């Protein structure tokens, strides 16, 4: 008690002290093992009006790729991860997945050449009813991407948050998007990205029933073979304001979130559920 009194007498407000103690509690958790999945949307200049937060300038993206390479990261795809979970493939020492949502045309025009130049690969989650529309990739673009070693995944047929739909419509979005991509001649679609990151237990079960093997969320953290393959963590990479410093902080966010997962698992059920609910509310307001 005397120690607490001394800290309180230092002039720091109690909420600040509590927040500092909570942060220390998280950061002293056993360091998690796992790899990050990075979430991108567009890489182009100038950005679409109203889409600025989702657009990374090409020179910034190039610097991020070069940073990952310099730090020893090796790019893999969700299918590589799925094979590793089944013991059919070994992952590199320091893997990372680069993921791109929505299927914008710059994914082919700008991103693909930059990845090929560096011998990197990625997964591109496309909305099937947007393919070929102005501003989006064409079927020929997708075939060329696949030939270049990229993985194509589903982002549903219409990009509607699945939790807003009745179960039969949810299944249509999962089934028809996968069916269309495969019917057009792409390889079997195994990976999925939840529109706006929205999911529930029923949707997760449907993905398995529809023969998907992995799905990515919008929740930060690290991933390993013990992670639920339908609840893979991702770190959003928005338009940066502080260059590589901000990018490094985003990677650190995945580590901190993973440590939080470790600590939450150590709490009583009621406390853990309360904190998880609060995190969900905060995530929805970002």
Residues covered by each model-derived region:
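Short histidine/acidic/glycine/proline-rich micro-motifs that form metal-
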Residues: 128-132, 161, 195-198
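Short, glycine/acidic-enriched loop or turn micro-motifs at the edges of active sites
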Residues: 104-105, 158
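C-terminal active-site subregion of NodB/CE4 polysaccharide deacetylases
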Residues: 2-4, 11-15, 19-99, 105-106, ...
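Acidic (Asp/Glu)-rich catalytic clusters
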Residues: 112-120, 137-154
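Histidine-centered catalytic micro-motifs
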Residues: 38-39, 151-159
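Charged helix-capping and loop-helix junction motifs
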Residues: 135-142, 169-173
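Short beta-strand and adjacent tight-turn residues that come in two discontinuous sequence segments
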Residues: 125, 155, 215-217
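Acidic, polar ligand-binding/catalytic clefts
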Residues: 96, 108-113, 122
């Amino acid at each position: 008690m005397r120690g607490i009194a001394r800290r309180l007498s230092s002039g720091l407000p109690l909420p600040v002290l509590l927040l500092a103690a909570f942060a220390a509690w998280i950061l002293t958790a056993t360091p998690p093992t796992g790899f990050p999945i990075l979430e991108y949307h567009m890489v182009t200049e100038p950005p679409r009006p109203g889409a600025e937060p989702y657009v990374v300038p090409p020179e910034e993206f190039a610097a991020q790729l070069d940073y990952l390479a310099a730090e020893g990261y090796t790019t893999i795809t969700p299918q590589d991860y799925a094979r590793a979970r089944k013991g059919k493939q070994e992952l590199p020492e320091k893997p990372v997945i680069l993921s791109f949502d929505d299927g914008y045309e710059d994914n082919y025009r700008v991103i693909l050449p930059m990845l090929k130049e560096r011998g990197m690969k990625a997964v591109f989650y496309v909305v099937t009813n947007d393919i070929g529309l102005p501003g989006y990739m064409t079927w020929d673009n997708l075939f060329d991407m696949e030939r270049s070693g990229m993985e194509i995944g589903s982002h549903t047929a219409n990009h509607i948050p699945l939790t807003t739909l009745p179960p039969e419509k949810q299944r249509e979005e999962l089934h028809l998007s996968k069916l269309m991509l495969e019917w057009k001649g792409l390889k079997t679609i195994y990976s999925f990205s939840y529109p706006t990151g929205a999911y529930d237990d029923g949707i997760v079960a449907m993905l398995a029933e529809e023969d998907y093997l992995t799905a990515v969320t919008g929740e930060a953290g690290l991933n390993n073979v013990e992670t639920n393959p339908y609840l893979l963590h991702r770190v959003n990479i928005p338009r940066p304001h502080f260059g590589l410093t901000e990018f490094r902080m985003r990677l650190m966010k995945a580590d901190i979130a993973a440590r939080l997962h470790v600590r939450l698992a150590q709490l009583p059920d009621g406390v853990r559920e309360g904190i998880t609910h609060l995190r969900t509310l905060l995530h929805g307001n970002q």
